[in-house]
Structures are given as structure tokens and as C-alpha cells.
Regions:
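Mid-bilayer segments of alpha-helical transmembrane spans in multi-pass integral membrane proteins
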Residues: 90-98
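A cytosolic-side transmembrane-helix exit/cap motif
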Residues: 99-111
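Interfacial segments of alpha-helical transmembrane regions
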Residues: 2-15, 64-67, 76-91
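Core segments of transmembrane alpha-helices
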Residues: 57-71, 132-141
Length: 149
């Protein structure tokens, strides 16, 4: 496999993952904001449960990590823009684990009548989703820049 093909495949999966994250931040999050707190408390655990079982969601977020290993073994770090994009992708995923997962857990533990706490968690989730989407978008841009050289 040529380096260009390997990078193109990595870019495709990274772009698919970034698209999913951007959809969550720009479409699904505003829809969650329209829900009352009790409905949000029911919806978010269901969304999380379905997301972790989704072949698409898990695949597009996992394939780049798995593919990075042979990429770095074979091609090292000779394409700095591409490597920077992979680093941003890793950062976006790490940010998701650090920021989003605790929110999912807290919302699942809250009762539907804890309106103020649910409202605050939803606000935090919106911020976390936007951060993750922005970093994911930057990762795709950085990786794509490599193809201009």
C-alpha cells in the first residue's frame, strides 16, 4: 500500500468520524436543548446506549486509531501536517472521554425532577460537543493540507 493510499483511507475515516461529531454538536445538541429536562434525562442515556452499539459510530472512531499503528511503523512521522491531524484526532477523542463520558454518567444517575442539575449538565454537554467537533474539524483540515504538498 502506498503512503498516499494509506493517508487517504485514514483521512476518509477521520472525516466520517468528524462528520458524526459535528452532526451531534450542530443538529442533535440543539434538538436536545429543545427537550424539557425530564425528556433530556431519558433521551441521553438512550442515545449513549445506541451510540456505543453502532457499528458505524464505533468503526469510524476506532479505525483511525488502529490504522495509526501500522502507519507510524511503516511511514514514521515524515508528513508533519498529516501527523498533526492525527494528533488532533487523538486529542478530540481524548477530550470526548474526559468531558462527555462523565456527563453521560451524571445524567444517567440524576432523577428527572432534578431540573437545575439536568439543565447544567445539558449546558456542559453542549460545550463539550462543540469543543470535540471543532478539534475534529481541525484534524481533518490538517490531514487534508498534506495532500496539497
Amino acid at each position: 500500500m502506498t503512503r498516499t493510499l494509506a493517508e487517504a483511507l485514514l483521512l476518509i475515516f477521520t472525516t466520517l468520524s468528524a462528520g458524526t461529531v459535528t452532526f451531534v454538536a450542530t443538529v442533535l445538541q440543539p434538538a436536545m436543548n429543545d427537550l424539557d429536562e425530564a425528556a433530556f434525562a431519558r433521551f441521553l442515556p438512550s442515545l449513549y446506549r445506541h451510540a456505543v452499539r453502532s457499528v458505524y459510530a464505533v468503526g469510524t472512531s476506532t479505525v483511525p486509531f488502529v490504522a495509526m499503528i501500522p502507519y507510524f511503523i511503516v511511514y514514521k512521522v515524515e508528513h508533519p501536517w498529516f501527523v498533526a491531524g492525527l494528533a488532533c484526532f487523538t486529542l478530540a477523542s481524548t477530550a470526548s472521554k474526559i468531558m462527555n463520558l462523565p456527563i453521560y454518567r451524571r445524567v444517567a444517575e440524576l432523577k428527572s425532577d432534578e431540573v437545575a442539575k439536568l439543565r447544567e449538565e445539558r449546558r456542559k454537554l453542549q460545550g463539550a460537543n462543540h469543543v470535540r467537533a471543532l478539534i475534529s474539524f481541525v484534524s481533518v483540515l490538517l490531514m487534508a493540507v498534506q495532500f496539497a504538498y
